[in-house]
Structures are given as structure tokens and as C-alpha cells.
Amino acid sequence: MKTQIVILIVAVLFLQLVSQSDAFLKGIIDTVSKLFGKRGLKNLDQYNDLFDGEISDADIKYLQDLMR
């Protein structure tokens, strides 16, 4: 009976370790793929969308004040 409990505890700990490391590794892989992907190589400026013809200078100033 004691052996079964020990095996159960070890199995639960191992499954938790695998699930947590899977999420950690997925985060690292996603970050690396974003850095070296097609979109990651572009110069992504946060104000690129502000240079639309429909947005006035006052709107741009207001949005820049919000971003500060």
C-alpha cells in the first residue's frame, strides 16, 4: 500500500513538472518565432496606424497623450 501511494505521488509530481515545462517551453518557442518570423523582422512602430488620412492632427496628439 505504501509503495502504491509513493508511486502515485511521484506520478502526480512528474505530470505537473511536464505540464509546467510544456507551457514554459511553448512561451520560449513563441518568443523566438516572433523574433525571427516574417512579422518579427519588420520595424513595428506603435504609431504606424496613426498615419491614416482620416485621422486629424488633434486626434494624433490626443492618442499620443494617452500613450504616455
Swiss-Prot record:
Residues 1-23 form the signal peptide. Residues 40-68 form a propeptide. Keywords: Amidation, Antibiotic, Antimicrobial, Cleavage on pair of basic residues, Cytolysis, Membrane, Secreted, Signal, Target cell membrane, Target membrane. GO terms for cellular component: extracellular region; membrane; other organism cell membrane. Its main location: secreted. The modification Phenylalanine amide is found at residue 36. GO terms for biological process: defense response to bacterium; killing of cells of another organism. It is found in: Secreted; Target cell membrane. It comes from the Eukaryota. Expressed by the venom gland. Belongs to the non-disulfide-bridged peptide (NDBP) superfamily. Short antimicrobial peptide (group 4) family. This is Amphipathic peptide CT2.
